[in-house]
Amino acid sequence: MRILKFSILLFYSTFLAKAQSNLKLTDYYNNPSSYNPAYVGVTEGLFIKGYYTSQWTDFEGSPSSQMIDLQNNFDNRNIAAGISILNDTFGILENLNVDTNFSLNFKSSQDISFSLGLKAGINSFSTDYQSLNILDRSELIFNENISKIIPVIGVGFYTHGKNWFLGISSPNIIENKISTESDEVLFKNTNQYFSTFGYNFYLDNFLFKNQFLAQIIEGIPISYIFSTKVIFKNYVSLSLHYQPQYLTGGEIGVYLPGNLKISYGMDISNTVGISKYDNNHRFSISFQIFKGKSNWSDRQEFDKPYIVR
């Protein structure tokens, strides 16, 4: 029973961590709209991206995430909107997040723009203890499957010039909690904040994109990650990233005709005592349609370095 209790505690510890920040920082910096709704006003036309990440791939029920992100910048209206759907699974735990993002876009000068964003959605948490092979179900927690829906309201600010960008956001400002029928608190939401800054420069046919992303959660040490991406024209990209004390990783992306981009990335844990099974793999595919143009263009990330694809 002590081993069983420890296993359940481990599951819940991971669940709470994922509930507090659905994705890893590497996944966040690849998907800015997941933490900053103001970003949806940056892209042009219609943008669609699919994203998949998995961890501990040799274990049944290992953590995995699937996300679909859609953004549309309406012509000549300074308004953009989008929707993102994120599904997290880890063994008996499932977290479904559905967000709508809205932004108002302004130009303060010819080269500098900024956006104000609002995020609204729901987060659904559920567990299925019946799928566990538990011999002794006498403890109440084993008899209570959890199914809760909590609201999500977030805000964000994003500004950029030709070769730099800066963003500040909070993806959920509502404090809420998840409890069992016996009033045991399993999860209490604490506001989290994100800050990002990037500076980019060209060297012949290469674009170097450098980004810093920090995540601040009350009562938890600040998490931050550094990344550098090199894009050769708009044919191929290679990026490296480092999160101190936690992970090192990289990603390669290929730009295809028809404004398609396919990427594969991997993270390797730097934590002492963590095995190779903690490696994280991710795949993504995206495409973009530019309105008012007869031909699609796959050059936006190279020509506009504040864009993340």
PLM features per residue range, with description:
Residues 20-309:
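Subset of outer-membrane beta-barrel
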Residues 2-9:
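Sec-dependent signal peptide recognition
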Residues 15-19:
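Sec/Tat signal peptide C-region and signal peptidase I cleavage site
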